[in-house]
Regions:
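Conserved C-terminal portion of the radical SAM core fold
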Residues: 128, 304, 323-329, 349-483
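A short, aliphatic-rich alpha-helical micro-motif
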Residues: 58-59, 267
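Core AdoMet radical
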Residues: 213-223, 234-257, 268-283, 296-313, ...
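Local cysteine-cluster metal-coordination motifs and their immediate loop/turn environment
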Residues: 133, 169-181, 223-233
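N-terminal pre-triad scaffold of radical SAM enzymes
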Residues: 116-131, 206-234, 270-274
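Short, basic/aromatic recognition patches
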Residues: 101-118
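Membrane-interface junctions of multi-pass transporters
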Residues: 137-182, 484-488
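Recognition helices and adjacent regulatory flanks at domain boundaries
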Residues: 104, 181-214, 224-226, 245-249, ...
Length: 489
């Protein structure tokens, strides 16, 4: 019998694995990275191996067991949560069922209440002069308000009350509802399970104990060094300048302006800070905040940086190593020239160099890929590249958004080619590293099977991209010939 024990990355895991082996009358084999032909009890953790590697090991084991270690013994609550999710996925066992009772409770809440999300109780985010529920929402809740006023603001209170009663709020939360229309999960699921676990909330009644936000999202400005084709002027000042020159800048356009918010960030309440842009690593306001936080001794909050990974200065490299819990979400939409074409101004060799530096210095890394008409037939290349160069890094897939669905991947001119790419991606190991990658691709594959080519929409996409190519001096056919040569076959 081969038994795989999952726990935290401490000596206690080895001791508990040894006890499991003794109780079953098998040998204790210790830390595992790959099985040999020996029988016995082995152990590992999500800190030692990537999600995909653990799932592959689980397939070879006769039993997979999550050890009964208290949440307080884990280095980070997310590590515990990720382990629970793996056990669920591989139909493993929990040594202590009571330990997952909180997780099961909130799963039931989400399954029975289509409107509930934890974020209005834990998050503070602003867009220009207004507070919004999260980065996925653009509708204001209220005027910008202080952290002290956040808990009792009438706008927030109304939304919280609606959610508790099971009422959906499509005016604020439509992004997640759209995810759930085509998938079995959404960001509201993930965020709720994460934060109820972190804050040890055992029931809906415990929400009343929250008096101040613990999660902050910041988009300081639209200052960015790239002009990504699926992005917009609100997230890149270069795109704003370009569209103005092309006379297609919306009349109601207004850039993000939250630079001064970094100065008023309440570090003492902060459990997590998510920073995006624009490009945070070229914003002096963000670098200034990091310097102040380090000097004030605030180095243990979770810091998540969404970056294009093109610019890691020596100053930033020295500074970021002083923080203890940093995750880099790196935006990549293709491999090599494909990425550089979609994400204009990027240079693949610089991204690779910076990724290797982050990986070598043991930072948490995940890849964020926007799936669009551009890369829908090239998704497998991203996963195959990760298999070869970064086998422990996972991918988060998201659908390209535009008001007129201009970049909808299901409008691709050759859906058979897209289907093949998805199938090849599903055959990789790294597809198991991201918590939702496999599920996202499987759902996408089902959507492909129920869609026909939209000639008019695809022609609109090509017409728009031709204007961009003419303005930028680039050529779609040289980089992505399948979008030209195999159009609507």
């Amino acid at each position: 019998m081969k038994v795989l024990c999952l726990g935290n990355n401490t000596l206690d895991t080895d001791d508990r694995c040894r006890a499991v082996a003794q109780s079953l009358g098998i040998d204790h084999r210790g830390l595992v990275s790959s099985f040999d032909h020996s029988q016995g009890a082995w152990h590992t953790s999500v800190m030692d191996l990537g999600r995909g590697d653990i799932i592959e090991l689980a397939k070879q084991a006769d039993r997979v067991l999550m050890l009964a270690q208290p949440l307080s013994a884990w280095s980070h609550p997310d590590s515990w949560l990720r382990t629970v999710e793996i056990i669920d996925e591989v139909n493993g066992e929990f040594q202590d069922q009571d330990a997952v009772s909180r997780y099961r409770y909130w799963q039931r809440v989400l399954e029975t209440n289509p409107g509930f999300c934890i974020l209005p109780w834990v998050e503070h985010m602003t867009r220009n002069d207004y507070a919004v529920l999260c980065c996925r929402s653009h509708k204001p809740v209220t005027k910008c308000l202080s952290v002290d006023d956040w808990a009792h603001d009438a706008g927030y209170q109304a939304i919280r009350a609606d959610m508790l009663q099971g009422h959906t709020r499509p005016d604020h939360c439509d992004a997640c509802y759209q995810q759930e229309a085509v998938s079995s999960s959404s960001d509201r699921y993930r965020e709720t399970l994460e934060w109820t676990n972190r804050l040890k909330l055992d029931s809906l009644a415990d929400l009343d104990s929250i008096r101040e936000p613990v999660y902050f999202e910041m988009r300081a400005s639209n200052k960015c060094n790239l002009k990504c084709r699926t992005c917009g002027p609100e997230y890149s000042h270069l795109i704003a300048h370009e569209r103005k020159a092309m006379q297609i800048l919306p009349a109601n356009y207004r850039a993000e302006r939250n630079n001064n918010r970094f100065e008023s960030m309440p570090m003492h309440t902060m459990r997590k800070l998510y920073v995006a842009g624009g490009e945070p690593l070229i914003m002096p306001e963000f670098i200034g905040f990091l310097n102040r936080a380090r000097d004030a001794g605030y180095r243990d909050f979770e810091l998540v940086i969404n970056t294009n990974c093109t610019t890691l200065t020596d100053q930033f490299r020295d500074l970021i190593q002083d923080f203890n819990n940093v995750t880099f979400i790196v935006s990549i939409d293709g491999v090599g020239a494909v990425n550089d074409y979609i994400r204009s101004n990027s240079q693949w060799y610089k991204i690779l160099s910076n990724l290797h530096w982050l990986n070598d210095h043991k930072f948490h890394i995940s890849i964020n890929t926007v799936v669009s008409t551009y890369n829908a037939a090239r998704l497998h290349e991203i996963f195959q590249w990760l298999d070869q160069d970064f086998p422990d890094i996972g991918v988060n897939l998201m659908t390209a958004f535009s008001a007129d669905n201009l970049f909808d991947a299901l409008h691709h001119g050759n859906l058979d080619l897209v289907r093949q790419s998805v199938q090849h991606a599903l055959a990789t190991k790294s597809v198991n590293n991201g918590p939702t990658s496999r599920r996202w691709l499987q759902d996408f594959l089902q959507q492909i099977g129920h869609r026909e080519n939209h000639v008019f929409a695809y022609e609109n996409f090509l017409a728009y991209n031709t204007r961009l190519d003419d303005h930028r001096g680039t050529c779609l056919g040289k980089i992505l010939p399948e979008l030209i040569d195999r159009k609507l076959q």
